[in-house]
């Protein structure tokens, strides 16, 4: 919580800058944040602008555009499961297709089968016609029971699937605010279980990729509401990655092959927070020619959500590179 308080203090003390230097730093001003938010809401109506309590409002943002929110976003798998990491099974368990575990066993003891067979033959002698009729009746009975059992097994499996999905289901409210200290968007998550009960922070951490859990995730009080605990996700190299994307666009322009929107989507699809311009570290400046076609500032949040998707792989919010 100390880290959360220090972060809030830093946000409060950092002066607001209204100058636009998106093309050189990858950072955005409050006005550009609003512009990017309008574009996100236009492309994906599940995201909406919202106001904040009077004492929590930021005067550098419009009263009705304090933050962006999307509610009840589904998450069916934890990050560990989504990334394909499996736990060991017990000795009595058998893993089936699609991750299901079969824990019961069928008793195929030969001695028991022999006893049952001898018991059937100890009942005395009957005539051949009675034996034939009895065998036919048994065959019909077996066929009927097999059909009924098959139907029951299918129903049980469907119920098992539904029960398992409901037990794993979580819902998230996602908030995007403007960070004055980093001059980039900042994401907050507030989660609920399948019964609508708020998740503990340690439970929400289960939905964050292990690569970022200890680096970019922090327990904080939601800054746009009172007494609401959240997990904040801030890719601290976000502005540097944006510069990487613009560097790709500039290089494409120099090769007389302007970076159109399709190329840009392909470039971002293969990038993550660890990518950088060859031969440069993230801390170094990247020279970008002015007026080079590439990412527009109103598309900023689409790229931002692309990054967040790698941090929270199991949360299914609306974003797509087609919006570029």
Swiss-Prot record:
Q: Which InterPro entries match?
A: Atg3/Atg10
Q: Where is this region: Flexible region?
A: 82-166
The positions flagged as active site in the entry are 236
Domain of life where this protein originates: Eukaryota
Q: Which UniProt keywords apply?
A: Autophagy, Cytoplasm, Protein transport, Transport, Ubl conjugation pathway
* Region spans: Disordered: 100-134
Q: Which GO terms describe its cellular component?
A: cytosol; mitochondrion; phagophore; phagophore assembly site
Cellular localisation: Cytoplasm
Pfam families (UniProt xref)? Autophagy_act_C
Keyword Transcription assigned:
no
Quaternary state and interactors:
Monomer. Interacts with ATG8 through an intermediate thioester bond through the C-terminal Gly of ATG8. Also interacts with the 40 amino acid C-terminal region of the E1-like ATG7 enzyme. Also interacts with the ATG12-ATG5 conjugate.
Family from the record: Belongs to the ATG3 family.
Q: What is known of its domains?
A: The N-terminal region is involved in phosphatidylethanolamine-binding and is required for ATG8-PE conjugation. The flexible region (FR) is required for ATG7-binding.
Full protein name: Autophagy-related protein 3
